[in-house]
Amino acid sequence: MKIVGWDIGGANLKASIINFKNYKIKSNQIYCPIWLNIDNLRKSIISIKNNFGNCDYHAVTMTAELVDIFKNKKKGVKKIIELFCKIFPEKKVFFYSINENFLKRKDAILNTDNISSMNWHASASFISKYIKNCILVDIGSSTTDIVPIK
């Protein structure tokens, strides 16, 4: 099984693929000025898709919904969801939620506030299972999150 984790940032698109058959991980990052044109995101996703080849599932976090090209955060989330589900089969795409679960397209669109800017939460939730007392610092191109974990 192969799973790609995507982080759609405000200026960069990051993705890592995990191959559970041979336990190999491959990562890719592309500068992606989404605020100039949403098509930059589409082209970047397709570039990484072509680099990684076929995979079974896609797990997505985002902060790009906050860039100026979108009228508001909700519209940005919906646009990004729809874009992903046009490139990949909808049944293979899941969006990380604040409830520590993954939502399919329909539920993600109905719960945009629960998936908007959840990249920090995904990292903090994962780390908290292994380290009980620390500070997570997530420095991106457009946001910085400082999260105490206790």
Task: Describe each model-derived feature in a short phrase.
Residues 1-10, 16-137, 147-150:
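Nucleotide/phosphate-binding catalytic cleft detector across ATP-hydrolyzing
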Residues 11, 142:
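Conserved Rossmann-like nucleotide-cofactor binding loop
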